[in-house]
C-alpha cells in the first residue's frame, strides 16, 4: 500500500512595503514547506507500519491545514488594514481642500 500526497507547496507573497506580520507570514510559509517535505518522505520511512505511516501523514496534513488557515487569516488582516488605511487617507485630503477654500475669506454682513 502506498500513500500519495498531492498539493500546492509554493506560495508567493509580494509586497513593496513591509507590512506588519510579514515576518510571521514568512515563518508560517517556511513551516508549511518543511511539513510538506516531511509529508513526502513519510512513505519511504523504514521501521514504520503502513498504519503508522497513514496516521503520521494525517497528522502532518492537519498541521499543514492549520498553518494555511493561520496564513489566510494574516493575509486577510493585512488586506483589511490596507483597505482601512486607503479609506482614511482620502478623507484627510478632502479636509485639507475644505480648509484652503475657506482660508483668507472674510464674511461681511450689511
Curated annotation (Swiss-Prot):
Biased composition (Polar residues): 1-20
Biased composition (Basic and acidic residues): 78-100
Xref: InterPro entries: FlxA
Recorded coiled-coil stretches: none
Membrane-spanning segments: none
Chain intervals for the UniProt region annotation (Disordered): 1-23, 78-110
Pfam families per UniProt: FlxA
Protein's name according to its UniProt entry: Protein FlxA
Record organism: Escherichia coli (strain K12)
Amino acid at each position: 500500500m502506498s500513500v500519495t500526497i498531492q498539493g500546492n507547496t509554493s506560495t508567493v507573497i509580494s509586497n513593496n512595503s513591509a507590512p506588519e506580520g510579514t515576518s510571521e507570514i514568512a515563518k508560517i510559509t517556511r513551516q508549511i514547506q518543511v511539513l510538506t517535505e516531511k509529508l513526502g518522505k513519510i512513505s519511504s520511512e523504514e521501521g514504520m507500519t503502513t498504519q503508522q505511516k497513514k496516521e503520521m501523514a494525517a497528522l502532518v496534513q492537519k498541521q499543514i491545514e492549520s498553518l494555511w488557515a493561520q496564513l489566510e487569516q494574516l493575509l486577510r488582516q493585512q488586506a483589511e488594514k490596507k483597505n482601512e488605511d486607503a479609506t482614511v487617507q482620502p478623507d484627510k485630503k478632502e479636509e485639507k481642500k475644505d480648509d484652503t477654500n475657506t482660508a483668507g475669506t472674510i464674511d461681511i454682513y450689511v
